[in-house]
């Protein structure tokens, strides 16, 4: 009996083993136990059974002892146990892929029989191995894998041990069965070391990695008919891993992986070409269904349950997965590598990388375009990627259809080519390319169109991660800070959302057909990532990666490895970002001001970066509109070479942008133009990565300050949110790609210059493309006719006007910025830090590589319609409180369009306005003291659309202006301020909307006419004497709800033209309307931010004085959200007045001691009697407003055009500003300003902006700036032109701005040259006056025709006029030496009179007449001698100036140090 069984065992095991004889088998038949010793397994059979990749081969497998235990009576429920003691396997890598694997021996043994009892028993075998040692020999290294306590067993669908009958799910209707296996081990030890060779001197440290308990879960789907495996799902699960790698070990790992990459890539291509057809199982399912129909019809309920269970655990396609719950990776420097420490800036550094829930999925056989809902970790990111990829596939299919038609037309219209006339690469057999006759084309195309396009996808997910800053031994021991991390928890994002999601997809045909295939695509999603700039970490990482790259290059050179990376192949890329944050911190000081920020953060709500045109706001039409906006500005024209630009600037608007916007850079465009012969091969529709045009779009982009003590842990706004678009192209790389040898199927890449018709024809109408071009291009003859020599538009040759990278930056909406002194100091410090960091990075690159860093040129264009910069300054000292508030407030600025000789008219006008304001004030005070006071808050009044206004010639006033707008500063001038109220009137400095520099929107309105124009007004009216009339519209109350008093603009504003006589408003000038909203309605960011020193929500406390006829009302508290809702619900013609709680003064007097401060809308405070509770509340609010009081100066900027040219170390910044209008708000509560400031730009100002710029700036730095000054290379050289500029300033604002710009340290000297021409500035002295002085100083108007201010390297300022500037002889130096000097230490400003005396010349006298003043000069010398002498003198003068500048700097530093010591 034993002999018979031995023969059967030999019969089956002989297929797996070598030299197996009966004497090696010990068998106990009754016990069901057997033992085999010294088994040598067959390598090829194991390769087929394990289905190893073809780049790996098994050389030898040996097992010292194997035992088997068979439970004869329980074969259905219990597995056969196979135990192996020690298995040794020797393997090697193949440089060329070996022959593909054959059929599995298990399937062969079953004789293609159906899935029966024997197959179930064999499949349920349980295997245990004490030790497995796998040795792999490769070209560059040797590796070994040692596994201990390996177990292989069958489990149920929930991965639990149990009865064998539950380890499989069989569906007779499908004719398929699912089986579940699990493999686990206690430990795996991995070692790798370089190959020892005498002629190779590559020294690599050995790599040793150890993992703890891990497991693999396998799900197999077989066919019942023949037991063949249809699909497999394999999941490798690794628990917590902690690996420490030195830089030498990491280098070794990268080198080993690189040595295998070429073989793995070849093997992958072989696998794709022999991939199984995905529809094989469908036919089997149908046949199996017919066979099993009679068996399954009897038990429909049971079958439904089986089908449901099978569907729940079905494996629809083969996939492999890696799951790591937590991975800690520590990378550190080699402590023994002393020879490298001299070159390293940071030595002994270590960095920790922590990854949580890392998963990698691989789907090798996914049909292109099919659903991915069955994927293991299907999520919203996968759904978004699928939608984007399907759009790409649809576009590709349309191109293929057009290509087929082009091939057909080409073969019909041209005779067949003979092989002798074609290039060798084009000589193809009829099988490979059968398009030689017109009769065969349709059948071939129909056959190829039925080919099934497959895709291979790799998905990487990362739930959370932390990359910590580098730590060194010199640092104090503390927990490391994050450099890159995920903020999902702080932003309350779903836990199932991945921090990083990356999916890469490639396409192929299973049979390896030479047919067009789509470009691979890469989709990435970044959620709530925060990047923190850490100087030490960036420098250490830069050195680490440079050293790694250098060692890899040496390794590849030694082993003669080819760099087969497909960097030049186009890949469709899309990167989505959600709530990304970029933080730039500053050095933390132990003691700092409460308004001193610790960091600046750059954030965006949503971001898209892509090189495809299938994403929102990144399409061809978006680029076309943006390009047209840039093209409409003369500043960006190639022919614009006037200041601030020059003829050396790059051509920003490169033709690549224009061609891409009109879809003229595609392969199909070239095919229909006749420049490429149409062929149906794999690379016909593929393009180079050099032709990519990238688009980056931020839906909301903003900048905050962080770490301010006054902010109470919340970020403080710096730049309010705005949408941002960036478009990028690479002209230099594109031109280089065109120089490379073209494939022979391309006739030429030249394109006709007749753009007019091409620009109009859009490739979106792809079906009409052929008809369109058939009338434009010449007929093709044999596909070899080249276009004319004039068709050179498409080929770009690199020139000095092209940079490596061109960027178009477009800001779509109005930009608002606010900054105080300490925030300004932070920006200066961060600017210096970033410059130092870039310099250190450049030096490290040169030190590691031994060669200069690559000089990259970048051209950046910036287009901004309007902006607003608010300077938050210290409060201005107020005037004497005993004076009349109106006498100090009324200082109307003389309109520029009025002649200066009209003194009487202006004087009478001032008196009239003063009387008007006094009348309004007295009426308001009396009205408040009459127990009917109220507060009018115009910050929430919805105004009409300014575009709907009638011209001033019809009505003189727009109907949409509310009543209180006429009380604003635009009509009444500057009203004096009240410290107790925390409100301010705006100064009449004009608006952005002024059409020319000579006109301001300052209107002098007869207030009595405004208030008195309709005596029958049922809302509010005053008589001509200023007495109060009846307030007929009583204030109604609804419990504790909002109290509203509605002014109707139609009733308050006249339509009769007779009012125009009292208003003196120009027909062309209409005051712009400001729409004021609460801050909550402005913030488009999904985060909580607050203005400086404010609570998170802007709360307005509203109250009203009650009359006897009114009900008792409680104090009403309204937050900004309620205000916003009511504003949205109200009619646009109504003006809501929310009654605001007044600030109670301690004094009992009725007059106002100091002026009120009201922001852009009159808030009239009540000073009547209040309850004790209200008094305490008011006193707290008054204290809060007083602490929050700041002087605000707003610069409204219109039309900003900028260009930044970077050539290696040289940087040129050209900036042009059409119009700048300062708006001096005076002392104002910061809360009111930030909550009530306008959100958008003034459309009228944008439309009527100046054609000629008021301010032009040019800044140069780097070695190229030495032509201006020796110091300019380091500190830069600034040139500024101010032309046709007209404005007004208060002396208090100028002094405040000076304090704002003061630095804590001695500022570096920046050479500069400033030209001011045709400029007028009105100066108003608003400094505090003594009580004895009743008259205030008259405004001073300064006219500057032409003035030049220069600053040299020694810090001195030189002031001269245009005549001195235009001289070109050597006398210029003498006059320059005699000109007025403004030393940086003293800032001694001389008067204009002393300038004329110091120069001792008259500007009107020509230079030749001045030769008498210089008798020592003789003009007999030749011009060449004089120029040579002049140059030598200039050099000596420059040296002297440098020495003087150093002396000045040293002196200033000492004075600063002495001053600091004195203060301390």
Swiss-Prot record:
UniProt feature, compositional bias: Polar residues: 278-297, 1164-1182, 1394-1413
Statement: the UniProt record of this protein carries the keyword Coiled coil: yes
Residue list for modification Phosphoserine: 414, 418, 774, 935, 1009
One Gene Ontology CC term in the entry: early endosome
Region annotation Disordered: where it falls in the sequence: 267-297, 409-436, 1066-1089, 1164-1183, 1392-1413
InterPro entries, A to Z: BLTP3A/B (IPR026728)
Location of the protein in the cell: Cytoplasm, Cytosol; Early endosome
Keywords from the named record: Coiled coil, Cytoplasm, Endosome, Phosphoprotein
Gene Ontology terms: biological process: early endosome to Golgi transport; intermembrane lipid transfer
GO molecular function: GARP complex binding; lipid transfer activity; protein homodimerization activity
Coiled-coil parts of chain: 1418-1456
Signal sequence, renumbered to the chain: none
Function: Tube-forming lipid transport protein which mediates the transfer of lipids between membranes at organelle contact sites. Required for retrograde traffic of vesicle clusters in the early endocytic pathway to the Golgi complex.
Record's subunit section: Monomer. Homodimer (via N-terminus). Associates with the Golgi-associated retrograde protein (GARP) complex. Interacts with GARP complex component VPS52. Interacts (via C-terminal coiled-coil domain) with STX6.
Name under which the protein is recorded: Bridge-like lipid transfer protein family member 3B
